[in-house]
Swiss-Prot record:
Identification of the protein by name: NADH dehydrogenase [ubiquinone] 1 beta subcomplex subunit 7
Positions carrying Phosphoserine: S73
Keyword Nucleus part of the UniProt annotation: no
Keywords: Disulfide bond, Electron transport, Lipoprotein, Membrane, Mitochondrion, Mitochondrion inner membrane, Myristate, Phosphoprotein, Primary mitochondrial disease, Respiratory chain, Transport
Membrane topology label: Peripheral membrane protein
InterPro entries per the UniProt record, alphabetical: NDUB7
Pfam families in the cross-refs: NDUF_B7
Keyword 4Fe-4S: no
């Protein structure tokens, strides 16, 4: 995800979303049937598993299962391959989804800027097909 840094510093920063901030557009904008993502693991389960704050994400339920498996089969560290795979795959899907959300936010910001520019041109009287009076003379 380094391309956003280059576009942010060298390109137009007004249409590039800040990756550290929450999205400015509602998640169901353009998707009326879209459901909100829900955490599978509850706050109490994450506290009981003593997960650090950095690990409390949408894949925490897989991590809790992995840590439990590691604890239950301690000497045999290879016994938890499936749990590890499930957690890694969930983290990958979460990363891809966040990148898609970032790209969606960037495109919506570009669209908003284009619409504002078009509205400003129409308000000035220089819409498509119209000629500025100074140019017509």
């Amino acid at each position: 995800m380094g391309a956003h840094l280059v576009r942010r510093y060298l390109g137009d920063a007004s249409v590039e979303p800040d990756p550290l901030q929450m999205p400015t557009f509602p998640p169901d904008y353009g998707f009326p049937e879209r459901k909100e993502r829900e955490m599978v693991a509850t706050q109490q389960e994450m506290m009981d598993a003593q997960l650090r704050l950095q690990l409390r994400d949408y894949c925490a339920h897989h991590l809790i299962r992995l840590l439990k498996c590691k604890r239950d089969s301690f000497p045999n560290f290879l016994a938890c391959k499936q749990e590890r795979h499930d957690w890694d795959y969930c983290e990958h899907r979460d990363y891809v989804m966040r990148m898609k959300e970032f790209e969606r936010e960037r495109r919506l910001l570009q669209r908003k800027k284009r619409r504002e520019k078009k509205a400003a041109e129409l308000a000035k009287g220089q819409g498509p097909g119209e000629v500025d009076p100074k140019v017509a003379l």
